[in-house]
Design a protein with these regions (language model features):
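Regulatory cytosolic signal-relay segments
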Residues: 1-48
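Short low-complexity stretches enriched in small and charged residues
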Residues: 5-14, 29-32, 59-64, 79, ...
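Catalytic core regions of nucleotide second-messenger enzymes
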Residues: 92-99, 130-145
Length: 145
């Protein structure tokens, strides 16, 4: 969710909102074949959808600061992040991509088994990309990711 900074926080309203959500009918949730449009998602409704998520990050990235300075680290992170995003973004079933630090995650709309199989192929492409990137990093005497 993108921040819009258009409202101030009110603790009393927040408490009421929590009560509204927790006391809502269990019938306020419906099954959907695909992920609903963002405009259809509110804090007052809910959907059951079949999705698959991929999370990929740089293991031990905090230790990389011991070996490399900022320009090198920035290049390593950018190469990793940009290619992860590119691979996921190439898939029509990928509906959401987020970057959190050195983690990239994508949410894929997977109503059918064949869609899940496709996400496994995406994971395989990500793995192959990491192997290529590590080869390139070794050639520059950088740490592998």
């Amino acid at each position: 969710m993108e921040s819009n900074n258009t409202m101030s926080y009110d603790g009393d309203k927040s408490s009421d909102s929590m009560d509204d959500i927790l006391n809502a009918s269990d019938n306020d949730y419906c099954d959907k074949d695909s992920i609903p449009a963002r405009s259809d998602l509110t804090f007052k409704n809910g959907y059951y959808v079949n999705v698959t998520a991929i999370f990929i990050d740089i293991v031990g990235s905090s230790d990389m600061t011991d070996e490399h300075k900022r320009p090198t680290l920035a290049k390593m992170y950018r190469a990793f992040l940009s290619e992860c995003v590119a691979i996921m973004n190439a898939e029509i079933d990928c509906k959401e991509i987020n970057i959190n630090g050195d983690c990239v995650w994508g949410v894929f709309d997977t109503p059918y088994k064949s869609d899940i199989d496709n996400v496994i192929s995406v994971a395989a492409r990500l793995n192959s990309m990491i192997k290529i990137l590590n080869y390139k990093l070794r050639k520059k005497n950088y740490s592998e990711i």
